[in-house]
Structures are given as structure tokens and as C-alpha cells.
Amino acid sequence: MIFQSFLLGNLVSLCMKIINSVVVVGLYYGFLTTFSIGPSYLFLLRAQVMEEGEEGTEKKVSGTTGFIMGQLMMFISIYYTPLHLALGRPHTITVLALPYLLFHFFWNNHKHFFDYGSTSRNSMRNLSIQCVFLNNLIFQLFNYFILPSSMLARLVNIYMFRCNNKMLFVTSSFVGWLIGHILFMKWVGLVLVWIQQNNSIRSNKYLVSELRNSMARIFSILFFITCVYYLGRMPSPIFTNKLKQMLETNEIEEETNLEIEKTSETKETKQEEEGFTEEDPSPSLFSEEKEDPDKIDETEKIRVNGKDKTKDEFHLKEACYKNSPTSYSGNQDISKLEILKKEKKILFWFQKPLIFLLFDYKRWNRPMRYIKNNRFENAVRNEMSQYFFYTCQNDGKQRISFTYPPSLSIFWEMIQRKISLATTEKFLYDDELYNYWIYTNEQKKNSLSNEFANRITVLDKGLFYIDVLDKKTRLCKSKNEYLQKDHDPLLNGSYRGIIKKTLLPFINNDETTVKKLIDEIFINKIHSVLGNCNNYQEFEYKKDPFKKNPISSKIRHFVTLMSQFDGESTFNQKGISLLSEHKQICSEDPEIFFKFLVDTIIADSFTQTIPKESIGIKEISKKVPHWSYQLIDESEQEEMENEKQVSWPHQIRSRSGKEVVFFTDKQENTDNPTPNTADISEQADEVVLTRYPQESDFRRDIIKGSMRSQRRKIVIWELFQANIHSPLFLDRTNKSSFFSITFSRLIKRIFKNYMGKNPELDISNYKEEELKKKEKAKEHKKDKEKKQEQIRLDIAETWDTIPGAQIIRSLILLTQSILRKYILLPLLITGKNIGRILLFQLPEWSDDFKEWTSEMHIKCTYNGVQLSEKEFPKNWLTDGMQIKILSPFCLKPWHKSMIRPYHQDKKKKEQNQIDAFCFLTVVGLETDIPFGPPRKRPSFFQPIFKQLDKKIEKLIKGNFQVRKRLKEKILFFLKLQNETNNWIIEIFPFFKKIIRKMSTVNTIGVFGLKEASSEIKSEKDSRIKNHMIHESSVQIRFLNQTNSSVTEKKMKDLANRTRIIKNKIEKISNDKLKMSPKKTRYGTKNLGQILKRRNARLIRNSNYILKFFRERIYGDIFLYIINIPKINTQLFLESTKNGIDKSIYNNESITKTNKNRIQFISTINKKFLPFLSTSKNNSKIISDFSFLSQAYVFYKLSQAKILNLYKLRLVLQYRGISLFLKNEIKDFFGTQGITNSELKTKKLPNSGMNQWKNWLKLKNNYQYNLSQLKWSRLVPQKWRNRVTEHCEVENTNLYQNEELINSKKHLLLLPDQKYNFQKNYRYDVLSYKFFNYKNKNDSYRYSYGLPFQVNKNQEFSYTYNYNINNNKFIDMWWNIPISNFSYLEKTKIMDIDKNIDRKYLDFKILDFSLRNKIDIEDWIDISTSINENTKTEPRNYQIVEKINKKSLVYSTIYQEIKQSDQKNKLFDWMGMNEKILSRPISNLEFWFFSEFFSFYNAYKMKPWVIPINLLFSNSNVSEKFSKNKSINRKKKTNPFIPSNEKKSFELENRNQDEKELVSKEDLGSYVQENYEKDIEEDYISFIDIKKPIKQKQPKSVIEAEFDLFLKRYLLFQLKWADSLNEKLMDNIQVYCLVLRLINPIEILISSIERKELSMDIMLDRKDFNCPNWKQKRVLIIEPIRLSIRGDGQFLLYQTIGISLVHKSKHQNNQKRYSENVDKKFLGERNKNNFDLLAPENLLSPRRRRELRILLCLNSRNNNGVNTNPMENRVKNCNQFFDEKKDLDRDKNTLRNLKFFLWPNYRLEDLACMNRFWFDTNNGSRFSILRIHMYPQF
């Protein structure tokens, strides 16, 4: 065994090391690069094939050497930087490559040009050998850069980033390439030897010599074709579209704008020196820059004062008041601009270097689409890489980072150049750097830990805890002044304001754009001044201009004006009253109006007092790379030309299309009777459509001059293929291929034929088949039409795609038109009339030429749009044309008379309308539509032949008598034949009867067998005949319905015959029975007859046998294959369930306990017993039962008999079980003899010291405690049934108010239900004792009776207190179930989880009216499960939950349970024994998300004051306040008071609440009597949340009702649409008032008359629902996003459990709150409190994360490069809970610290750690699943 393990281990490790070594990987990648065969191989193969003799061998050697040297240089250039830069620069390679190519072609085509006549054999002097060496060397270098090669050659570069020993990798990859190259050359040599030895090739010596002589020319041609093919893919480096005009204009504009800025800056300084500044209001009013788009975040090199500066120096412009005295209408520096333009035109060509003329690095050199951005006129360079590789320090070591900032790396390189060599040598080595990094991390960790511990100690002293909290980091201007909140980048949330800044569009300084400037810009400026003063009052730069001088009265006049025309650019009001002195300004001249408006605002607001300091906004912007060009497409160019703006040639290719003019409207000029042609062209209105070809346009939206896309894997098999695509999408095309028929379709087709209908029903399906045939014919016709249409379109596209084809076609059409009109048709007319003359008939010259003249040829566009007769379409020669023939001429043999009957005349007119026009084809034929098939014309000779037939018939009619006699003779013979047939039919039965009588007795045959029974044979014959007659009768019945008279007659004859035959056969059979009714005779059967019958029977039944066999195959095999996954999954689920059950019981106990089966623990089905092993190991398994409560398991085991449970000893003595068991349970099992004394003596751990660990042990008990509705959304039914098989408890200690219920109906419990109820009580007590086993207070003793036998002095029940802390909004960590997450949708439906498969009705679905049945909580009882029993109760119960509404943050719940007589307590099933109460709206709690009720108005008032998690806390407003409650409201509650004071205040409130509830006897009567006071008090409660200082400030009735309206219908978060303005809000308020009134009709009518209520906006009660509002865009409903999905319950639960810890700084309330509740319900408990504060919240989130990482990640274990930081973190986190290592250390500080740190980890923090801290991001969110959130024990 040792030897085998030694061998196997060594072999595996050795193989893994060899495979993963750098040498093997390098050899593999190098071998792969051999297959990247490029043009450089042509020279190598040329030398191998062509050269012979001694010189040929030298050339072969030199070619191979050059090839290898070139490849070696390429491999070295990967590692050696200077060589890589030299070979990688496109300028150098291209400049060297192009002359060398020319030289090479010149050398090959003129061989004797460099022939010096030297006969020396020295290879160094032979220039041709050297050229072979150079060719192979240089073209190996070109292969990577000038000629694109395959991806295989670049694999070496890819692996370089992963390899540490790069030089070894490069060497090994070169060796691998060399091996592959040698093998390739050997293979080429073998092929050449085979060619030389081939007899067929050697016999043709002449061809071989010719081929050898022309080999050089063939290789040069191949090389030239390859180079052209490769170079055709990339744009030419010299002849490119440089966009010179835009380049010049952009540069000139940049420089001129900078000059203007420079002059304005000098003016500013001068003016500041003089002591005053004058502001320029036009740009400064609106915080916008000039119209120059090039100012925005560009990185272009520009000239300022003779120095090169980048645009980065200018991208943080002050968008503020520029202190230059320029006006809004123009620029004072226009003269300077013109001078600069002239200078730049002269100096432009001299400043350009040669490289920029040849190569423009800013041009589009890849296939790129131009994406416009409205904010930036120039396009963003989106092909810039998001990754930048550079070395950086990570985990104390130098590593490559792919997200390193490029600017930082460049800056670091610049610094390194400046630093001397002496300083660079002082840098730390790798190991020293790593140790130093560890040391600094330890220092950071210690300092943070000490600070953290100090904060905790300060907090324990009871000081004011706000000073303990870590403050947020903020920027400050000085020591005493913070930076403004909206400008502070370290803040987030609502402090950061959003400034809507609309940049001005690109505007040219032309006269035509002045109107647009006035219309668009100035109104936006005015609106921004007036609008921003109201909206952004916190922004200082908006408030400062109006601090010293208020807004003048003139501006106030325009507030209403601007609000009406928000966003519009023009005013259309006829008369607008502006001021008293300006009464009306007509809107006919709006320019005067706007100028007046702007001048008024400027003069009034800003020229009276001028601030000394200009206010600037430092814009926080991100630098985005842009192209230096502004490109436009054809449509934009046309728009600019139409608007007479300065346009430039378009550079973006549009889709190739043709403009089709289908309507031209020419308006005649009435003023000018002889208009010019120019006037006509201006007035002509053309309606144009663009026609695009159906082929794929690969050039659309591509910039001119950019490289075309290198499309691969596209197969073109047709000469003209419209839509080319990859074979990958072959299945999506319409063409049916062989591969599209899948195997499944083939199977279906086979079995469909054999499993079809019976052949007996074929006759009855005759009509259906006829209908199917007709449908198929219709489909075939449609398909034919589609094919013809496709052919027509293909022909049209073919003419379009072939270059020059339209010119040829147009000329051919014109010649065909002339030939038809003037040559062909006149010749036909003359030939016809000459023929008539020769046949002695009158000619029809006039008629024919009349029809000929009516034919007109009209030129049409390519699409067939008709023009005038003499007018040609535009660009007809290039775009194509059609010729339409109106009234086409058709040659007729004669013309009929004009007088015809009416119906013939009508048909003729219809035919003429059809043939009214046609189109001429290229061949000269006629077609109905362009490029359609040629139509058939009536034949010229067809009417002539018809006339000849008529003549012949007349001749035949002359011999009518002869024909009559012949006919009589024929009829006589036919009649005679019919009579003989009838006679034979009558005689046939008589002969048949005689034959049957003779055949009854047969002679003995050869084999001597017995007689045959004639009866059996006759029965068989009659059966067969009856079968045939039945078929014919069915056929007769069906065919009698046909309309044909001939078939009808035949069918009647057949029916008569069959009837006669049938009657005679029946008569014969009856006679036979009379002759021998009882006697059975046996006839003889020979062997041949028997075999013949069996053969026939087998043949007859073989079809049915085969059919049955196929059906069985299909039904058994294929359906079984389909159901295999289902069977496997079912077996797996059942086996897991049985395995779990078997681990609890064993086989014997199962068989004995089957009679008393309980629904929570499933027994093993006997069917699956063979699949389960019965070994002892399985009996010891006790796995994580996520669906079983362990306490319940032990409880059920305690109820079982001793004999059945004696084998549970192994289970109960399992290691770790003692931690779960209480002493009472151990004693009980000990009395049963199941456990031993060891189990009882084990010491329990201190749960107060290690609560998190205890919760982890118990975490599986209730992690899937979901309600029925939530389970139905998460998992399938069967799995749900298994998981939810744990007990849940009913809240039966609910003390209801009988006076308020006022119900006489009682639902009596059945005995079974009572038993189950008692069982739940027992488990309730057991589970409470189980969880709270650390509590040593044994003053309570539990029993199993229905009413708990407890002290009467105690006013509490343990039924409600086993999970008391569940309802706090900050929960204990060991007690967080998944039901806490369901606070959002707290179901008011009874949880009927005890019977899981039971169907029940959800009462929330029912439609209740708005006024009646409102208080749903009053008549639906709440029954909660084991983790939900202290949730919100309805208002008519005495469990009253109090909340102090004065504080926005602090939330407490006080519960009081009154002990009452248990005899009157009845089980309330679904709350149906209560009366449905009619309550007003004011007593309503909104029933969907009632947790939002308490903080609704406060959150609406100031949303960011309250942490959002408080809305999800379990706090509900109870409306049953007593009169004494107002006393508590008067006291101001401060959430930030110290803990001692606050505790006393809470105790005082608690005592008052107890007195209220004890003294109150009838809560329902109190609510009914004090109805109006309750309404008022309800309103005041909301006001108190908003205004906690003031006691009572009641709202108006409208506001209060409006709040209630929103409270009622706020089922989702409502996001108001923009259309919901003040008018709609007024309507809502009136509507809310009306809802409460008893008789609202009068107020409705009056409000409608006063126009306060609009019935168009508001909806009536029937249509009052959210979908209608959503359709009318009144509301946008955004439901709360819950992270619940049907899969991944584990991740769902863990995420919820982690995220439930509250993030608020006020979590210290949790401790005081838990103490109050515990003292109230349980009396004085131990000092080991379970609810402790999470002290890490004292730190800020950033420092908290830093502390976590420094503590959790042991930096000394993080050694390797490939180690996973997640795994290291998990490994170290396990040490927190290791009792041997960790818990024995400093118990007072370290253990408590780590205890609180790890549970408060959040999932998002872990994700951030993965992405940012470790600088890695694998793009997979599933990497988080590798985290072991809870360590194993």
C-alpha cells in the first residue's frame, strides 16, 4: 500500500508539474504558431521548389536561415523593449515596407538589371543568395504589422502576462516553433519527392520545364495578390480622407478662442487693479460656457503664447460671470478673429510636420461607428482601452495591475527620470518591502483597535454618545467654515444638488441664426434665472446676486409668463400685458419683445449694485477622450445647406439609397406672368422618399477612410447574394436544407404515418381531403407568387449592384422603345394588311394606325413613378429608369363591329382596363410590373383557327342523315348488350345455389382429413361479403349527395344490384340453416388449405401486428426516455427524504410506529427500502435538518413508547447533542433508560459570552420559517411540503374584547383540534425553555394543560414570551428568522401551516367597498407562527402596541397581556365569529404595508432624516389611545438624551400605559363614544411626528383627509408624474373631503361649479384603481423591490440575516429597549443580556471596513500570487470561533471585539472587498458563494 501510494503520488505530482511548467507551455504555444502561415512562407517554398544545383542548396540554406532569424527577432522583440518599439511603430515599418516591395517587384521582373557578370562562386558576392536571405528575414517581420496574420501567432503575447519567468518562456516557445517548422519543411520535402517520382508528371517533361521556368512569375503573382488582399483591408496610409477643412477650422477656432480668453483675462486684471469690475451678464447669468464645443474636456494640443499646452489645463473652467464688458449681441474681438484666420491660413502648411501629413493618429483607423453626444459636439473615443497595465504594490509585493491610472504611471516615469541613480538604488527589495508592508498593517490595526476600544470604554461610562461616534470627513474652507454641502465631494445623498445645465448648440455667427439665438437662448437664460431662484435656494451662487438687491417688480411680472411657457422657444400670445408703461406688445415682432425682456432684466437686476467678487463654480468633470473632428452625415449636410448655414462635406457614410420623387407641386407665380426658371425651381415643392436596396449595406454609418470590418466565416455561393450571413445562422433562413430536418421530426413523421387513422375510415375522410387539397393549392399559389416577387426583387437588385448596369439597361430600354414604336409595329401592321389583300379581304389601315397612335411611351423613375411623356427622370442614366406603355398596341387579324351586346361590351371594357398599361422589358416584351414576368398576349392566329373550325363543322352538318342512321344502329346494339347482361345476372344466383349444394359433401382428399364444416365456411363468406357490402353502402350514402347526374344514375343502379344480391344471399343462408339446424358435419381439410388460410390470416394481420409493435416502441421506449429526468429527480427527492427519516429512526421502529404516524416526521415508504443502506454509520448520521425543529423531534420522541425508542441511544449520545438538550429533557430520557449519566453531567457553555456561536448552532431550526403564501412563490409544492414539516404555534392567548366583538356565533372546536391545540401549547413551552436555557429562574413550571398553570400574580404568559425579542426593529443575532424579512408584507391572514396541503381562501383578494367593511383587521383574526406571535394586533384586541410618535427615530413597542378566564376563550377560526364593523376612513390603517404607517408623514416631510431601515421595523400605530396619552405627548422626547435619563422616562411612560389598560374595561365602547375625538387625535398624531415640540396644531379638514387618502392608497411607493400639477392636487384634496361626507352630492356639485373639481382628471369610485391611473399617466407606480426569487433560498436567507442589522447611529436604543421589555414580561433576569450593542457602528463605514479587513485578513498568510483572498479570509474567520486557539486569549477585549465584528459583516462589503481591496474582478457574482458565512463546528 505504501509503495502504491508513493508511486501514484509521485507520478501525479510530477505530471502536474510538467504540464504546468513554463517550458511545456512555451513549447505548446510555439508549436501552435507554426500553423500561422503567412506570405513570408511564399519565399521559403519558392526557394525549396525552384532552386537546383549547388547554388540552389545555398539559396535553400540562406532562405531557411533568414526565415528562422526573422522569427527569432520576433520572439526577442516580445521581451526586448527597444526592438519591440522599433518594429511596432507603424511609421517606420510602413516607410521601410513600401520601398522594399517596389524594389522586390522590380528585381523579379528585370532579372538582369543587377547582373554584374561575375562568375565567382563565393556566396557572399552572389547578390541573389543575399536577397533570398533578406526576403525571408524581412517579410517575417512584416507579417505581424503590415500584413495581418492569424490569431495563433499572437498567443505567445497573451501568455506573457501570466508567466513569471518570461525569458524561459520566450526561449521555449521559439524552440517549439522551430520543431514545428522543421516538421513542416520535412513534409514539404516529402511532397516534392513524391511529385518528382510520379510517373505521370515525369512523362510530361515539356510541361515540367515550362512550369519550372514560369515558377518565379507564379510566385510573384501570388505574392502580389496576397499583398493586395491584405492591404485592401486597411486604409491607405497616404491617400486618406484627412478632413482637412474641419481640421483647419477646428484648430483656428481653438486658437482664436484662447486668444479671446487671454485678452479677457488681461482686461480682468486691469479692471481689478482699477478697483471695480463690470460683469458680462450674457454668459454669466446662466452658468454656461460659450458656444464653442471644443472647450469641453478635450485632450488636444493647442498653441497658447507659443507653448504647447493640453486642453486639460482648461477643462476646469469657471462657469461664472466673466468680467469682460462684452454684450449679448456680438463680440468685440471680431476684427482680431479675422486677422488670426488670415494668419493661420498662411502658416498652416509650414507648421505641419511630415508625419502628420502621412499619418494622422487621430483618424478612425478601425471599423467604428460615429456615436453622437448632445453634450459634446465631437464624438467620444469609445475604443480607448479600459485597462492599463502597470506594476504597483499590492499586498506588499510588486504585481501587475490592469486598472492602474495611466496619468499616474506617466507621472511616475517622469519622476524617475528626474531622480538620480543614487536615490533609486535605495528602494526596498521585494522581501524587505513585504516585511515593511506587514509592519505598517500591524501598526494600522493596533491604532484602529486601540481607538475602537477607547470609544467603547467612553460609551460604557455613560457619557454623551454623539461625541463617541466617528464623524464624517468633510472638506472645509477654513478652520471654522465647512465647504458648502452641495459642493462637497465627500458627501452623498440629498446634500449633493443636481444642476441642470443645458449646453448651447453649435451656432455659427451668421445673420440667419440671430432669430434662433433670440428664440432659443435668451428665453432659456431668463427661465433659468427665474426658475432656479425658486428651486435651488440652497445653492449659494444662485442666492448671492439677489442678496443685496431684491428681485425687481418687473421680473415678478414674468414669473407667471415663464411658468406657462416652460420649455417653449416661441411665444404666440396675441397680447401680453407686460408693464403699465408698456401696455401691449404685439407678437408679430417677437424679437423686440425678447430684446426688451433681456434688457429689462439686465438693467434692473445686475447693474444697480455690482458684487466685488465674481462667483464661480468649479465643475467636477471627468476627462473623456474625444476625436478632434466634428463629423456629419448626408442628412445633416443637406439640412445645413437648406438652412443656408456653413456646411462642410459629410464624412459619415449613410446607407446607400436613392431618392424617389413621387409628387411635384409647381406653384405658378401670379405676380410675375413670365417667371424665370430659378423662380420656378424655388417654388417647386417635391415630396421625396428614399428607396433603400434590400441587400446588406456594410458601409452604413462608417466614417469615410476607416478600415472595413474583417468579416470572417461568411460563405458566398451565388454570383449576386443579397443577404450574406454566417453558416451559424443557417437554421434561421427560409431556405430548407437537409440539415434542418432534425431527428425528432423524423421520428414523429414515421410514427405519424403508422399510427394514423384506420383504413376503414378513408372513405369518410374524402371531403376533408378535398378541402385540404384546395388549401394546399391556395398555399402553393401564394408560394408561387412570393417566389415570383422574390425573383423580381432579385433582378432589380442585380441591376442595382452591378456597376454600370443601369447605364446599359437605360440605353437598351430606349432602343427597345424606339424599335417597338417606329419599326416593329408598323412592319406588323403592313404585313397584316398585305395578307388581307392577298386573301381578297378589305385592309384595315385606318383602324390599325389609330390604335398604333394611341400607344404612348412614358419615361418613369426606377420604381415606376410616372412622369410626363417627354420628360426624363433625374439622373436616369445612373439611377435607372422604366418605360411605361399606355394603351399598348395588340395586332388583331380583323376588327369587330362596334355594335355588340351589353354584356360583351362590359367584359371588353374590363379587359381593356386591365390591359390599359404595361412596362417594357429589356428584351422588348411587356410586363405588368417592373422586372416582372412577361405577360401573355392574345395570339394573332387563334381567332383564325376558330373560324376554320366553324367552317368544318358546317360541312359535317351537311351529312346529317347518314349520321342519324349510324346512331340508331349503335343504340340498338347497346340495348341488346344490356339485356343479355341483365339475363346473366338473373341466372347467376341459380347456378351458384347448385354449386353450393354439390360442394356440401366432398370426397376424401389425399391426406384423409375430416369433413369441413360448410356452416363455418358460409359464415366466413357471408362475413366477408357483408363487410364488402357495408363498405359500398357507406360509399353510396356519401356519394348520393353529389350533384352530378351521371354519377347519380350509376349509384342507383349499383344500389339496386347490391340490394338484390344481399337478399338472395340471406335467403340461401336461411335455407341452409333449415336443412341442418343441429347436426354438425365435418368435412375434409387437406394440409394445403390449412396452410393457405393461415398464410392469408398472417398476411392480413401483419399490418396490425407491425402497427401495434411500433406503438409499443413509441409508448414504452421514447416516453420512458422523456420521463427519465422526472423519475430520477423524484427518486432523488424521495431517497433524501427517506434517508433523513432513517437517520432518526431505524427499520424496526418505523414498522412499529406506523400506526401512530404524525404529519411532521415522514416515515419511509417501503417501496424505497431496498435503496437505503442499513449500516450503523447511517444510524449515527444527524445532519442539518433545515426543515425539522430539533426541540419538536425530542418532544415527539418523549411521547413515544420506551420499547420503540431504545435504539435512539446512539443518536442522543452523539457528540455535540448535549449542547442542545436541557436538563429537564435529559432527566426525562434518563428515566426512560435511553440516555446515560454522561449526557447529563456535561457543562453547558455560557451563552451570554458566546451568543453568536450559540445562534449559529441553532440557525437551522427556523431559517425556513416562511408563511404559506411566501412558500408558494419560492419553491415547488412537494419540496415545500417536506421543508415546512415543523410545528408552528397558534396565538391562542389572545384576549379579545367581547363587548367590541358583539357576536353571538361561536365556532366550537372539535376534539381533534383541541388536542392539536394542546400539543402546540406543549411544544410552545418546550421551545421557550429550550432557547432560554441559560435563564436560571425556575419560578415558572410548565404543564401540559390547555390553560397554563402559572402564578396568578404574574401578568404574563410564556406563550407570548418565548420569542419576545423577535419584534424589535434591531433583533438578537441568534434569533433572526426569515419571517423578520416579511415585516414588509405582514400577512393578516391566518397561517394555516399546520395543515400544509390545505386549500384556503385569501380574504385580501375580496373586493371591499370604500366605506363599508373598511377595517379589515377588525374581522380577520391574526394567527402567527412560531416566530411571529407578537406582531401587530387589530384594534379591538387588548394587546395594545404603543409607539412614541414624537421621535423620528426612536421606536418602542409596549405590550400588555391581561389574564382573563380561560373558560370563555374559544378558538377563532379565520376570525369569522366576529361581526363586520362599519368604520370611517379616519380609523383606517392601510392594510397592505402597515409597517409604513408610523413613519409615513415624517418620511414624507423630510425623507433623509429617518434611516430607510426604520420603515421596515415592526412598529405599528395603535389608534386606541387613552385620554391620558395626551399627557405623554406634551413631553418632548429627544432621541439623543443619555441612556439613564431616557430609561427613567420610558419607565414612566410604561407605568402610565399599564394604568390605562388596567382601568379601561370597555375599549370598544370608548372608541364608539369618542368617535370624533378619535378622528382628531388621529390627525394630531401625524402632526406630532412632524412637529414634536408643539402639542396640538390641527390641520384643515382638507389636508387631514388628503393624508388619510394617501395613507389608504399608498400600497406602493408613488412617484408623481410631471403632469400631476397643482390643479390635480387641488382635485385630490376636494375628492378626499368628499369621500368622508355622508351626503357628498351637494358639495360635489358646488365644487364642480366653482371649478375646484374636474371630472376629467378625477376618477369615480368604480374606476378608482391604480391601473387606470397608470394608463392616464397620472401615477407611476413603483413597487418596492424585494430581493426574493424562486431559486437560491440559501443565498436569500443569508442575505436577509446579514442585512437586518440596523445601520443607524441610534442603535443603543436597542439595549435599553430590550431591558424594559424583559423586565416587563419576565421580571428581573440575569445581567448577561442577550441584546448587546454592535459597537462597530461607532466608526464610519470606511474606517469600519478598514478595521474588518485588517483584523480578518492575516497578512502573514498571504504569500503567493495565485492565492485566493476569499479563501484566506474564510480561513482566518474560522479562528474567531475556535475554542482551543482563540477563546483562550484576552477574553475581555479581543473575544468581544471579534464577536461583534464578524456578525455585522454585510454582503456588499464583501463584494467591495473582492473588487476594490484586492484589485481583482472576475466578473462573476457567484464567487461570493464561496464565502463560508458561518464557520463549521
UniProtKB/Swiss-Prot annotation:
Compartments in which it is found: Plastid, Chloroplast inner membrane
GO cellular component, one term: chloroplast inner membrane
Signal peptide: none
Superkingdom: Eukaryota
Compositionally biased tracts (Basic and acidic residues): 259-273, 292-301
Keyword entries, A-Z: Chloroplast, Membrane, Plastid, Plastid inner membrane, Protein transport, Transmembrane, Transmembrane helix, Transport
The UniProt record lists the keyword Chloroplast: yes
Keyword Transport: yes
The name this protein goes by in its record: Protein TIC 214
Gene transcribed to yield this protein: TIC214
